[in-house]
Curated annotation (Swiss-Prot):
The gene is rpsN. This is Small ribosomal subunit protein uS14. The keyword Chaperone does not apply. The lineage of its organism: Bacteria, Bacillati, Bacillota, Bacilli, Bacillales. Pfam families: Ribosomal_S14 (PF00253). Belongs to the universal ribosomal protein uS14 family. GO terms for biological process: translation. Part of the 30S ribosomal subunit. Contacts proteins S3 and S10. GO terms for molecular function: rRNA binding; structural constituent of ribosome.
Amino acid sequence: MAKKSMIAREVKRQALVERYAEQRAELKAQGDYIGLSKLPRNSSAVRLHNRCSITGRPHGYIGKFGISRIKFRDLAHKGQIPGVKKASW
């Protein structure tokens, strides 16, 4: 489990990215790179890192489900992810 501060930091970054998305797009379209540099650093989508929504784990992230491979396996075995079943051939 990731530290609570790391999870909170990532949530804060996500909020900043959403807040400044339109403004960043306009400045980028105009080519105003000085204006872009004056925006907060964490408002750039490049600074986001994919994290598991349950544990905050940064590695082994499955984007389609928004969780790590470990939690995915656990929830899939319990049948808590709709449409997912163990492969057999």
